[in-house]
């Protein structure tokens, strides 16, 4: 995992104004856990693709407690291919990335129980729960969920298909 900028990411091209709004209408991307890992781990199989996409496409991005905790859990797990020694060692890596001016932190302010956001009848497997939650969070914030997962099911989230962004 990238330590102290072993592979620098593109500089931020936008900043927040005094109200916390972004200075242009470009989309904000909520990164799923795999995108965060790919961006910060230069040994990850998708690192080059993620980095190129980030540099070429992203003006503003977001994370939430779920994606941050998922990153910490996975990259510090001993069976991860390039593990850090502990979650405590992974925290500063992620904190440095999240300190960028193009980052937003979103509180968990959507629920899969909210029928206005989610059609629970379309949640057909446990594998859809986290993806649907992140997609609903992106929709709530008028953003897009950035993922490598081409099979991500969007039908449970109202507006989900338009909010999904698959990194090619």
Locate each region found by the language model.
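A generic structural signal for short hydrophobic patches within well-formed alpha-helices
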Residues: 36, 68-71, 152-153
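Short, well-structured N-terminal submotif of metal-dependent ribonuclease cores
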Residues: 1-63, 75-92
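A secondary-structure boundary/capping signal
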Residues: 32-33, 67, 148
């Amino acid at each position: 995992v990238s330590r102290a900028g072993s592979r620098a990411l593109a500089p931020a091209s936008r900043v927040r104004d005094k109200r916390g709004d972004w200075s242009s209408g470009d989309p904000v991307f909520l990164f799923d856990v795999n995108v965060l890992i790919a961006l910060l781990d230069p040994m990850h199989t998708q690192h080059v693709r993620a980095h190129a996409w980030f540099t070429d496409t992203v003006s503003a991005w977001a994370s939430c407690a779920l994606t941050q905790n998922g990153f910490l859990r996975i990259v510090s797990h001993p069976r991860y291919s390039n593990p850090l020694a502990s979650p405590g060692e992974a925290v500063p890596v992620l904190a440095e990335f999240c300190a960028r001016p193009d980052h937003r932190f979103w509180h968990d302010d959507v629920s899969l129980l909210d029928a206005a956001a989610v059609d629970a009848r379309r949640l057909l497997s446990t594998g859809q729960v986290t993806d649907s939650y992140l997609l609903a969070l992106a929709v709530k914030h008028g953003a897009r969920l950035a993922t490598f997962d081409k099979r991500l099911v969007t039908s449970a989230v109202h507006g989900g298909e338009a909010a999904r962004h698959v990194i090619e």
